[in-house]
Amino acid sequence: MAKVIKFPIQTPEKFGFKPVRRRKTTSDKKPGQLNLFTGGKLVKLNQLSSFEEALLMDEQGDAKAKGLYQKAIQEGDAIADAYCNLGIIESEAKNFGKAIDCFTLSLKEEPRHFESHYNLANLYAEIGNFPLAKVHYETSIEIEPEFPNSHFNLGLTLAMNKEIENAILSLMNYRKRATAEEKCHADELISTLTRTITT
């Protein structure tokens, strides 16, 4: 008679949110149109924009960052980035509805905003909405295919959604992009998932 041995299942940690750490450049240029005034440049001396100030406060853990991100949005300063980072603040405060609203407003402003798709996927996975998490992880991979955490988290989400074969494939994609130390963790997960298929 065969004996079934249960292996202890370790819940792998998901990677956290990915805040926007720099101001993205926006181009007002029209395709095929030459700029006649390339030499002129407005230089602000020792003055940060509202978004840059919010980012600085946020990195220091200052609660004023939330208000400064809102100010940046009102001023039209890095709107998608500000909404994204505001979504992280709301998510960390467990205001999931507000966080989802912030991330989707960021995507309304910039539909291919990588960090918003990735963070929205993390949030959906955290609250247990795996089908929506899957969609946003897949979108973040389409936008930035070399970001390893998207592949790892997609693998975890697929495993939670009982899509084991696809989870293994996603973890193998993560493994290709991971450091040597991170590969060991991925190998353990792949091995565990493979055993669930073969038994």
Where are the predicted features?
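Helix-start (N-cap) detector for alpha-helical repeat units in TPR-like alpha-solenoids
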Residues: 47, 80-81, 114-115, 148-149, ...
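Long, contiguous interaction/recruitment modules in multidomain scaffold/adaptor proteins
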Residues: 1-49
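Alpha-helical segment of the N-proximal tetratricopeptide repeat
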Residues: 40-81, 85-92
